[in-house]
Amino acid sequence: MTLVAGIDSSTQSCKVVIRDADTGVLIRSSRASHPDGTEVDPEFWFDALQEAIAQAGGLDDVAAISVGGQQHGMVALDATGAVIRPALLWNDNRSA
């Protein structure tokens, strides 16, 4: 059986599904929450990704991965690529 993974990092959580590539049958899945609010430290997203992958049994037996994520957020980086402030999410309406 060939397994494929889908990963979705939304505003609220990171979700992982592992499916049989031939039948589409769900083999295993998991979800790890993101913090509430309109600003978030991007490190939380990475932590949630790692947690969701671990809870789904890992990816060692997976042949392919597809990733989707929330958009309309901004992560500010310095010249070295380091995060300099919490990410501003799409639901921040302070400038509306």
Swiss-Prot record:
Its EC number(s): 2.7.1.17
An annotated Gene Ontology molecular function: D-xylulokinase activity
InterPro entries: ATPase_NBD, FGGY_Carb_Kinase, FGGY_N
Residues binding substrate: Q71, H72
Catalysis: reaction(s): D-xylulose + ATP = D-xylulose 5-phosphate + ADP + H(+)
PANTHER family documented for this protein: SUGAR KINASE (PTHR43095), XYLULOSE KINASE (PTHR43095:SF5)
General function of this protein: Catalyzes the phosphorylation of D-xylulose to D-xylulose 5-phosphate.
Protein name, as recorded: Xylulose kinase
Lineage: Bacteria, Bacillati, Actinomycetota, Actinomycetes, Micrococcales
Gene: xylB
